[in-house]
Amino acid sequence: LLVLLTPEKSAVLVGKPGVGKTAIVEGLAYRIQRGEVPDLLKGYKIINMKTASLLGTMPNGESKVQLMIDELKQEEKIILFIDEIHMLIGATDTSSVDFANIFKEGLGRGSIKVIGATTTEEYERYILRDKAFTRRFQKILVPEPTREETIEIMMGTLPKIEKTTGAKLKYTNFIKEKIMAFLVDLTSEYKRIFEIGSRYPDISLTLLKQAFSYAMFDNSKEVNIFHIQKAIENSKNVYPDVIKKYLIVFDEKF
């Protein structure tokens, strides 16, 4: 929020895959909608732009990025969210410097704010060397949540998953929290398949969502222990030997 309140500055969220960079922006949108932000940010709306839609040029040769900015200049109080923003570095016709400079007028007026997101590796590889970009976009490091924070995130996300799927995890909050803790422990750092590269909370949330998928496949409005067990058995994010051990523990606990 402090970066967005700073004139001529926008933010770029930097963190490992799966740490919740997009969720931060969703949380900001929720707070803006509820008016739980400083007065200067009230009335802003967030537009989520797909990076792929901004790459390249139009048939007439005009840069898609430039075209987007020209359209946004007609609007007021816009926060543009661009995931994988590193893909736009060097995507304009002349050089990578152009991308940051294209935003100069909008950022200067304060009517356009940008939140970018990228991984730590892509930031160091593409963005760090772009001085024009780093002048206008302040790096915000997004660390991986702790075990306890991830359990809390999962408990907070559960109602949203239930609303989206129409299925319910019908247990007491005590049992629900035990289930979340189990899924979080199952997906801790040294149990993850290295090539997957995902982190808390996404890797744990993926397991939970898979359990809901199995319930929907069964045409069930309730997610039960067997659906969770099935999600664990078929997980592609955790080493097979870890899954075998945890399934035994799962049977004992639940």
Language-model features and meaning:
Residues 1-254:
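AAA+ P-loop NTPase nucleotide-binding core of proteostasis motors
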